[in-house]
Amino acid sequence: MAMKKKISTSSIMPDWSQLPEELLHIISTHLEDHYFDAVHARSVCRSWRSTFPFPSSLLRQSYSLPAFPLESKDLCCTLEKVPLFLFRVLTPPDAADASSEYFLGGLGQDKSNDHVELPSPLQCSVKVNVPGTEPILMNMLDCQIIPLGHKYRLMIGCNPEEYSAAFLPLNEQGGGGEFVALLDCTDLFLVLRSTEMRWIRLEKPSTASCKELFTFRGRFYATFFNGDTFVIDPSSLEATPLTPHIDSNFLVPSGNEELFLVKTDFLRCRVSRLDEEAAEWVEVSDLGDRVLFLGGHLGNFYCSAKELPHGCGLTGDSILFTVGSRNVTYPYKYGVHTNKRKAEDNINCWRSSRENRVLFRNRYDPVLSFRVER
């Protein structure tokens, strides 16, 4: 009997390190706006890691600030920009389990003491730290990754502080790198302009604790737990109240396109968008392809359902509350009928749809973890 010649695996796999430099340069120019593809390329072989720089948009950009007036003057102060992403774990189309796993959180380089550089293709991995469980090493190639914007956190020395922070770049088109930073320090606001590089104390416009700080169309927005909402001009620092005054509300910026107000008693919701010219809220019955994520330690975010495939459990024109005492919930949809009599059944609002059950694994820092069952 003739013996079959054993074929070496190395003879089958191409040696990507031998690719011409000219071709690598052409590839790199097409990856400038596709940062996760650049990460994938870096994981092909060791020589490619020096050819393809790590995407700057995935790095936690930081701004050095003057010594923080409420802390020791010997400690340095930095404001860190944390990119946020929604990870959807890919499952085979014929999988018996029809559920979809999601992780929502910030992304940064692994600087832990036990960090080791992994061989290709595991170099293209994310370590997921869910409280109460062992860290999970998740290959990016097995995930769909959707950017959700970013948040800012204040670092005093090497430790993150629990101060809400908002950052507003000025004159981005003209360059110069000027900015204004606004911090919530419990009893007062602190403001810093890059042109002066000193902290200015700003009296809070509300007696309640601040709920969230964010920016929209070149201005700061501050919401408070008593329902107050103020718009703060970055030049004059004048705070203008934004009506209506409602205890249970969520403000959700959709990039710089729309600002949504979600009013809820958690049984039903009404949604309005801000008409800046008329200075009023206009009620809407359609969110388009948007999925709104409300509450939780990461704040309020949205993603476009156009980027999500059919059958993944999340669809456009829906609201998902990531805050609450129960670990099970359902996406809210507009026009859902209840079991009440027709005369009492007001369908002109968002209600729990009971379509796809959402099971939360973790709601707390640093990552939101949940499963959508279909």
Swiss-Prot record:
Top-level taxon of the source organism: Eukaryota
Species of origin: Arabidopsis thaliana (Mouse-ear cress)
Identification of the protein by name: F-box/kelch-repeat protein At2g24250
Residues annotated as domain F-box: 14-63
Keyword terms of this UniProt record: Kelch repeat, Repeat
Kelch repeats: 100-150, 249-301
